[in-house]
Regions:
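Hydrophobic core segments of alpha-helical transmembrane domains in multi-pass membrane transport
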Residues: 43-52, 65-74, 93-98, 119-127, ...
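Divalent-cation-assisted or electrostatically stabilized phosphate/pyrophosphate-binding catalytic cores
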Residues: 106-107, 112, 116-129
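Membrane-helix interface "capping/anchor" motifs
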Residues: 52-63, 102-113
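Interfacial loop-to-helix junctions that mark the boundaries of transmembrane helices
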Residues: 30-37, 79-84, 107, 131-132
Length: 170
């Protein structure tokens, strides 16, 4: 067995990851070590796009989740870092298959955007600043806790009723 790319990154830098023989193409095709379901970004992407095409899931959560990780990856590691964070670990699996769970994700479009951004933010905070190299599952769980509050905020915003008139006013 060998270290996973995120494990190597947690103890070094992007140079260490690429010096250990991991290439972006290896990450994309799944020619690296890792847990089942997190190694082939290509296979997960095909499966996720199929679910979107069949309208089983909405694209809002996966797109905002992955885009948030990409933007924060640009900030903390440049373009190579952004691609690495998207292709390594369980991000693609979490974005397409876990975060889109009907029961634990928001129902309204604005809520889905907030949920996806929150998942991406927590994922990157855990990956960059915590001692645990993978943060996707924890990020999704944290956002699942916040889902009722996100739904409540978005529901009030979307279905806002007009203010009641004061007595004597029409």
């Amino acid at each position: 067995t060998s270290a996973t790319p995120l494990g190597v990154l947690s103890h070094g830098s992007f140079a260490d990851v690429y010096n250990d023989g991991f290439t972006k193409m290896d990450l994309f095709l799944g020619n690296v070590g890792g847990c089942i379901g997190e190694v082939s970004a290509l296979a997960i992407l095909i499966g996720g796009l199929f679910l979107i095409w069949k309208k089983v899931i909405s694209p809002i959560i996966p797109v905002t989740f992955i885009a948030t990780v990409f933007v924060l990856g640009l900030i903390w590691g440049g373009f190579d870092g952004a691609l690495f964070h998207i292709l390594a670990g369980g991000l693609m699996l979490g974005a397409f298959f876990c975060a889109t769970d009907y029961v634990t994700s928001p129902t309204l479009p604005l809520g889905k955007v907030i949920f996806g951004i929150g998942c991406g933010l927590f994922t990157m905070l855990i990956r960059i600043f915590a001692s645990y190299p993978e943060g996707v599952s924890f990020a999704i769980l944290l956002m699942n806790i916040l889902t009722p509050y996100i739904d409540k905020i978005c529901e009030k915003r979307m279905y806002k009723l007009p203010k009641k008139a004061k007595e004597g006013e029409k």
